[in-house]
Amino acid sequence: MQTVSSYGVELRKQNIPVRQTLEIYRSAVSYLTEIYEQVWEKLAEIPDAKRRFNAAEHLVHTTKKNPARFDFDLRFPKMPSYLRRAAIQHALGSVSSYETRMDLWEKSGEKVGKPRLAYENHAMPVFYRDVMYREEKEGKDEAYLKLYDGHDWKWFCVHLNHTDMEYLRRNWSGKKASAPTLEKRHHKYFLRFSYTEEVTLTKTPVKEQIICSVDLGINTDAVCTIMRADGTVLGRKFINHPSEKDRMYRTLGRIRRFQREHGSAQSRGRWAYTKRLNIELGRKIAGAIVKNAEENHADVIVFEYLEMQGKISGKKKQKLHLWRKRDIQKRCEHQAHRKGMRVSRVCAWNTSRLAYDGSGSVSRDLKNHSLCVFQTGKRYNCDLSASYNIGARYFIRELLKSLPVTERSLLEAKVPPVKRRTSCVYADLKELHLQMEILKAA
């Protein structure tokens, strides 16, 4: 399979016309969007995407054999051909999306929510190699970009952030990068490079697999358990970043006090800072999970399928909204695939509520919420028990799925809890493995 990774390299502050280039490109996209909205009925009659694009370009660009219908070349003289085509493609996509949404709205018979075609856009130009972007000699933190200085398109030498370039040389040397895209974040400009890799995911049989089951929590960031198909636990790891969470909760307290006195209108910058802290925390958690799985030679990383719907209320509302569970799983999936590992998800119902030893529901410790008490009186870490159950559910599903129907029915009769994925626990996996060994020996 293919994996696509990207990295943004910061453009160091200097006197180069990046803003003027961005403005003229967005003006071109807006102008083209207006044009293609007018002639969309004729363009829509062309089914082939390539022919439609050629017809759209002929409307605005004059050649020796083709006089243009619209004055795009006069409004935007000497615009590089690749940049012009990128603007055409963006405008065609905007109009096509608008027309599709309009058709769906008209068919639905709704009177509200009418789609609107936005001419003001946030399009970012792509600097195609050789014609818009040239690399400096290897080892130098410089590149050449073709930019618009207000009068003409000229080549400008731009200085790139040394730390970012060192990262690319260290991790992506020898791999081909796509044409960089301009990006603006936090009042800074970046060139984002994308890299495509061919990776082969592991095909280890289920009975020989080693998995890393992960329970994502709010109080503890993540608990990982390394497990075999027979239920043998090879390792456990608690991942927690208390200082990062403390910093984030401290900023949330400041926001709360500020909004109490001044309202929420002026707290936008504070929320943006908190969001960036939360994103960085998600990156660290995902990196730690994948690193632990790789060190233990895991074939699969197993998560809960976390779906939170409905209104969240109460004192934990803010924490739950900032819980980046999907982002962590998405980052882990990308990093795991790059290393050849697979990612799987299991039903999340009752993983924390049921004790891993099969004794039934647990009671949370009132003084320490991370601990729970089993019905046998045993005190145990609740997240660790949940990670055992997550790994067990994965193996129960995969082991039963690969068996013939008659053999599966026989095992389900001997171990009834495995029929329901919402209630099976780690003890059921141990019992299932025992019954499979007995059946194999018979």
PLM features per residue range, with description:
Residues 1-442:
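Nucleic-acid substrate recognition interfaces
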